[in-house]
């Protein structure tokens, strides 16, 4: 475990020598992060609205979490309540009025005490069962017969489904960063507010792309703060991170999207992880204070969730074998663990991470695991198909030896690379070149019947912290990416294929190819997939024109090829994989109701405004700008290729344009004896008195840029916002 301290200590020594000012002014430069107020999602008043909402959420420790049940017919609920409240229950119904509901009774256990309010909380856990696929339900939950308002939740297909992968939300991790225009670190509360806004945005963007996702997997580190020195009693009662859990659980979408959380190193040593989440099939194997391993099935897939903060490989082996035995006949086996054992970020070469690799990988291979999902390094990486990596004891380094070499490179921002033979031999040996499978059948983005495992490392889904990739890309890496923008993956599964697509949340462009693993496909499987695709033809008007054209062309090609009943297996697999990807890539058109409302209001404002220099009038240039913004919004409304993401961005940009227009109104300021534009201080400049919820100069960059379509019609100067992304020097702290 590597912690960078040299620069921090140097900064503190200098600070003490020079001044008695609080050392927080000299807080060490932290990792890259996404400063929420400058993101595209924060524009049009969204950030200010979030800040107001956050005030009602930040002290709410009682928010609900929903986790997949032991199989697709179940869901698990968990929430805090006052210890005086008893009898936790969940009701489920197919009717909004909750008629004909079924009631499920749960259990309570002691949780934590809020030291400020002296409120003692208990953890409520309820499992509901009997769920049918592709069905709309409504649920309420509560204690003492006090029920929440009904919430809609939809079950999805179990034979052809999609789930999301999110890496390291780590809400609150940006606390050491300094906001634009400030001199001190923002601290925990503001960092949680910042990171939670971005976390909300990632989930909303993911659901805009795939509204029928079955669930999400978080690769660990839901929160950030923990006490490494706490004894067991203190760890079980720890509450300093409850505000972070409040932020993590704050997205409204999580009230209807189950999440399977992995125990990360920041979660592992605090008891409240186990109070907030009701995991299925839990085990004492792989346990830390937060809990142990668990597993569940969904359709034809077994999901194995490992707590590898416990490094006892024999316990993980025993658990994996038990999970596989209990699951029975499944097509896919997916393991999730936190540490990126085949990643490419700044933790990936650490001896303790690599040591964990060589303990676990043989177990995965013995049990025919297909895909391993990880996080920890806050950067994206996809491995090649790997099998048979072996540790070279002769070149292995101790943690201290490795840190001495790595520090030189790290502290030079990788401009000075170590050429020491011992270090280079170590790095070469852990590239596992012998594990790279070269005899694969690959057609485009499809890999057929691979012998080996695909490893995915998820980037940060919240932008609370980013790490760099290491300067020497490992041989086992097929692709990697880091541009300090939150990302998520959409993973779709059916009986013979599994596809992974990964998106950046600012433009919603893919950061990597869609990779599809195709198992043995028979001619009958292809005919079934064609029939499934043809069923979508009646819904043509629901999808964006560009994705529909690609889908329709692929379907026609598949049907033509399938006319030959003597196709070889390789061609059948290729056609099947291509058709599945085309179906997965279909994007729904956006709902333009809100945009039309904003257009109507903007037109009314424009039509009622008068050009002139008198108070209450507007400059002609301002009217021209607003007219351009309105016309651009109308273009989005009339487009056949506008997804929900594009429509939402159009709403945001039109709101910005309206606000800018309103700020140009001529006002008479008696005290100054003159006429000025609204927002002016009377001398031609604009006041910029910063408050904690406001956004300083919006010329700051967050890495946001527009979708290709948005660039075409939304990024005109009249409504565009140039955004940049601050990327700060890394301080690696695990």
What residue ranges belong to the model's regions?
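Bacterial N-terminal signal peptides that target proteins for export
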Residues: 2-9
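Bacterial N-terminal signal peptides
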Residues: 12-20
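Sec-dependent signal peptide cleavage junction
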Residues: 19-33, 696-707, 726-731
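Divalent metal-dependent phosphoesterase catalytic cores across multiple superfamilies
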Residues: 31-262, 268-289, 318-325, 353-367
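Extended active-site neighborhood of metal-dependent phosphoesterases/phosphodiesterases
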Residues: 122-128, 136-157, 178, 183-189, ...
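Active-site environment of divalent metal-dependent phosphoester hydrolases
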Residues: 171-175, 223-227, 263-271, 312-314, ...
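Short acidic, glycine-rich surface-loop motifs adjacent to enzyme active sites
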Residues: 213, 219-226, 327-347
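Beta-rich interaction/scaffold domains
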Residues: 521-701, 709-715, 719-729
């Amino acid at each position: 475990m590597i912690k960078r301290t040299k620069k921090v200590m140097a900064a503190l020594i200098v600070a003490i020598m020079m001044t008695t000012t609080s050392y927080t002014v000299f807080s060490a430069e932290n990792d890259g992060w996404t400063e929420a107020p400058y993101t595209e999602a924060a524009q049009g008043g969204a950030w200010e609205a979030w800040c107001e909402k956050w005030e009602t959420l930040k002290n709410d420790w009682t928010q609900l979490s929903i986790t997949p049940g032991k199989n697709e017919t179940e869901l698990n609920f968990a929430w805090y309540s006052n210890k005086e409240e008893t009898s936790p229950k969940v009701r489920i119904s197919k009717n909004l009025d909750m008629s004909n509901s079924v009631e499920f009774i749960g259990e309570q256990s002691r949780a934590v005490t809020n030291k400020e309010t002296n409120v003692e909380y208990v953890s409520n856990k309820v499992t509901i069962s009997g769920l049918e696929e592709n069905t709309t339900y409504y649920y309420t939950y509560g204690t003492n017969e006090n029920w929440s308002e009904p919430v809609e939740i939809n079950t999805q297909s179990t034979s052809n489904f999609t789930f999301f992968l999110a890496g390291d939300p780590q809400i609150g991790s940006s606390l050491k960063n300094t906001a634009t225009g400030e001199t001190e670190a923002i601290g925990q509360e503001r960092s949680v507010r910042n990171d939670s806004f971005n976390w909300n945005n990632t989930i909303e963007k993911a659901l805009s792309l795939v509204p029928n996702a079955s669930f999400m997997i978080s690769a660990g580190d839901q929160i950030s703060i923990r006490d490494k020195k706490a004894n067991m009693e203190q760890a079980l009662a720890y509450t300093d991170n409850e505000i972070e859990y409040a932020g993590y659980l704050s997205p409204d979408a999580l009230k209807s999207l189950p999440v399977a959380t992995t125990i990360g190193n920041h979660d592992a040593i605090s008891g409240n992880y186990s109070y907030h989440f009701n995991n299925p099939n839990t085990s004492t194997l792989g346990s830390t204070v937060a809990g142990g391993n668990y597993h569940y099935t969904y359709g034809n897939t077994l999901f194995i969730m490992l707590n590898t903060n416990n490094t006892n490989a024999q316990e993980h082996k025993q658990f994996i074998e038990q999970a596989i035995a209990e699951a029975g006949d499944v097509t896919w086996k997916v393991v999730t663990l936190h540490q990126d054992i085949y990643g490419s970020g700044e933790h990936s070469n650490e001896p303790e991470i690599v040591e964990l690799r060589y303990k676990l990988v043989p177990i995965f291979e013995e049990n025919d695991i297909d895909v391993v999902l990880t996080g920890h390094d806050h950067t994206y990486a996809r491995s090649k198909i790997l099998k048979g990596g072996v540790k070279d004891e002769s070149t292995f380094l101790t943690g201290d030896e490795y840190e001495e070499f790595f520090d030189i490179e790290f502290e030079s921002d990788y401009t000075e690379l170590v050429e020491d033979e011992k270090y280079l031999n170590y790095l070469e040996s852990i590239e596992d070149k012998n594990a790279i499978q070269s005899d694969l059948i690959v057609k485009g983005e499809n890999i057929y019947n691979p012998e080996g495992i695909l490893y995915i490392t998820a980037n940060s889904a919240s932008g609370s912290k980013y790490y760099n990739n290491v300067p020497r890309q490992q041989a086992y890496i097929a692709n990697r990416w880091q541009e300090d923008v939150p990302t998520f993956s959409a993973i779709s599964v059916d009986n013979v294929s599994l596809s992974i697509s990964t998106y950046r949340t600012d433009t919603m462009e893919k950061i990597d190819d869609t990779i599809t693993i195709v198992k043995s496909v028979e001619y009958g499987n292809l005919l079934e997939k064609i029939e499934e695709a043809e069923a979508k033809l009646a819904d043509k008007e629901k999808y964006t024109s560009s994705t529909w054209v690609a889908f329709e062309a692929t379907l026609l090609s598949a049907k033509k090829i399938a006319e030959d009943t003597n196709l070889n297996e390789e061609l059948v697999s290729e056609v099947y994989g291509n058709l599945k990807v085309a179906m997965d890539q279909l994007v729904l058109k956006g709902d333009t109701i809100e945009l039309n409302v904003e257009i109507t209001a903007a037109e009314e404002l424009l039509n009622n405004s008068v050009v002139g220099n008198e108070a209450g009038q507007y400059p002609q240039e301002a009217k021209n700008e607003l007219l351009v913004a309105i016309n651009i919004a109308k273009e989005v409304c009339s487009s056949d290729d506008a997804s929900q993401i594009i429509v939402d961005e159009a709403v945001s940009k039109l709101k910005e344009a309206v606000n800018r227009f309103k700020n140009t109104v001529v006002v008479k300021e008696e005290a100054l004896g003159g006429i000025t534009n609204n927002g002016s201080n009377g001398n031609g400049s604009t006041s910029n008195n910063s408050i904690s919820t406001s956004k300083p100069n919006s010329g700051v960059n967050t890495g946001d840029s527009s979708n290709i379509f948005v660039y075409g019609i939304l990024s005109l100067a009249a409504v565009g916002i140039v955004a940049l992304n601050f990327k700060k020097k890394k301080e690696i702290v695990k």
